[in-house]
């Protein structure tokens, strides 16, 4: 039944019930996926056809990345948004793992318990370089936040001891 439907081809990057990797073989009885950890996963086609499949290689090769970054309360929102866009732009100029198909963007999305959260959106050139793109952006965020004095929160716990 899987071969009649063909939801993916060899070489496509897919997620089948949360298992992510590149399809290396589609046979009559099973499908083989090479995971990001370089492990070969064999999945029976009966299991594949009865589960949700996400094909990251269709309809386009690029992959939209959504990343949440938290900053401390009291941070200048305009400065944070500008700095995050500058970080993505700098990473895109210095690495070949990005796509220009969707313009990078930043949104202030949440007042969280200990941070103001922003979502950055950018495109990796393909699923195979998604982590490389995230790494490049994160390194630039750290560099720019340090230069501009923007602080990222970390979990803290205050313990008060009662007097006996």
Locations of regions flagged by a protein language model:
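Soluble accessory domains appended to multi-pass membrane transport proteins
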Residues: 1-100
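Solvent-exposed, non-transmembrane regulatory segments of membrane-associated proteins
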Residues: 71, 75, 79, 85, ...
């Amino acid at each position: 039944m899987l071969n009649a439907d063909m939801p993916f081809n060899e070489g496509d990057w897919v997620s089948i019930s949360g298992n992510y990797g590149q399809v290396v073989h589609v046979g009559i009885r099973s499908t083989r996926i090479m995971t990001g950890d370089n492990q070969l996963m064999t999945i029976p086609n009966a299991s594949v056809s009865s589960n949700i499949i996400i094909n990251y290689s269709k309809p386009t090769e690029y992959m939209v990345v959504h990343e949440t970054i938290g900053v401390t309360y009291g941070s200048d929102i305009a400065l944070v948004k500008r700095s995050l866009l500058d970080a993505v732009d700098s990473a895109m100029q210095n690495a070949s793992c990005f796509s220009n198909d969707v313009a990078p963007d930043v949104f202030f999305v949440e007042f969280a318990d200990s941070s103001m959260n922003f979502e950055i959106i950018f495109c990796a050139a393909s699923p195979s370089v998604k982590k490389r793109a995230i790494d490049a952006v994160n390194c630039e965020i750290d560099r720019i936040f340090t230069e501009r004095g923007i602080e990222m929160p970390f979990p803290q716990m205050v313990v008060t001891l009662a007097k006996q």
